[in-house]
Amino acid sequence: MTELYWRAATDAGSYDGTALISVGQGAVHLRTDLPAGTLENAVATLSWPMAENEKIFMNGYQTWTECPELPKWGRQRGTDHIPKFLLDKYAFDRYGDYHFVRYSKRKGMSHGFSYCYFRSGEHYRLVASLDETPGYTIFYYDAKAAVLRIERDCAGVCHGGSAFAAFDLFFAEGSEDEVFDAWFAALGCRPRTTKKLAGYSSWYNRYQNIDEASMLEDLQGCRALFKPGDLFQIDDGWEAKVGDWLETDPAKFPHGLRPLADAAHESGFLAGLWLAPFVCEKESLLCKNHPDWLLQVDGQPWCCGSNWSSFYALDIDNP
């Protein structure tokens, strides 16, 4: 057993508490009444030693986040080693959590989102979140102090008073299957009963270098490889500009996409199409005609990266 210390606060008051935790305890729910106000933080810490040969995995912020297993004294790299002129040109610091999560330069310091595990051979210790509704659950590990720190990404949110769900955590140990099956069961996740979807996507063969002729050529090849009901998907490169989803590139697809969709259906395949609905590139008509649709930070559109002509996030909270 180890003691977990936790705190939750608004600008009108706070609560400090403790809870006894065992590694394989299962669900732990930390809730308290807080006065109405603006949330300042929700933090939990507990002693969590690692063996020298143990590995740690911290789940990344999103699918482009590099998140390998690390040794006890491994280190996560931020963007501090990238020259500023490259950061400015390619916006490398816009592809992850670099602007809102602190990166330590020390060995043995790591962080991740929603779940983490500690692995010694085939034995796992899992610490995970059961509910991200109140805000992301962020895990920080300090190997030197042997402390696991857990934060709720809730600062600045308005709290109406009374009950606040600071953390809903899950602790498990055992084999990989045992800990993850137990976590998924606690989340209410059930195995999917639908059949797996197989097929073709143009991205991994041609990237953006696609046109009507090349797609018809690839469709012909798919007829010899895939079964009826499989997927034929046209990926990035068909659109005039990212964000202008009602227009095809007139040079690449002068007849639009209907003939290709019809040809895929006639071949017995499902027709798929790639979209990136939450962003638009700088040169798109959407960006030029609807600048008020873009997410603003300090009064300026927030650039998310250098892909295409550079791209911006849409403000999905703006009706």
Regions found by a protein language model. Give the residues of each.
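An acidic-aromatic substrate-binding cleft motif
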Residues: 179-228, 236-240
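The substrate-binding groove and active-site-proximal loops of carbohydrate-active enzymes
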Residues: 197-213, 240-255, 305-319
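Active-site-adjacent "subsite" loops/lids of carbohydrate-active enzymes
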Residues: 204, 273-319
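N-terminal accessory beta-strand-rich subdomains and adjacent acidic, glycine-rich linkers
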Residues: 1-182
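Short, flexible loop/turn elements at secondary-structure junctions
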Residues: 10, 34-36, 50, 154, ...
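Acidic/aromatic-lined carbohydrate-recognition and catalytic surfaces
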Residues: 235-290
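Conserved, mostly hydrophobic/aromatic
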Residues: 32, 161, 200, 232, ...
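Loop/turn elements at helix/coil->beta-strand transitions in domains of secreted/extracellular proteins
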Residues: 195-196, 227-231, 266-272
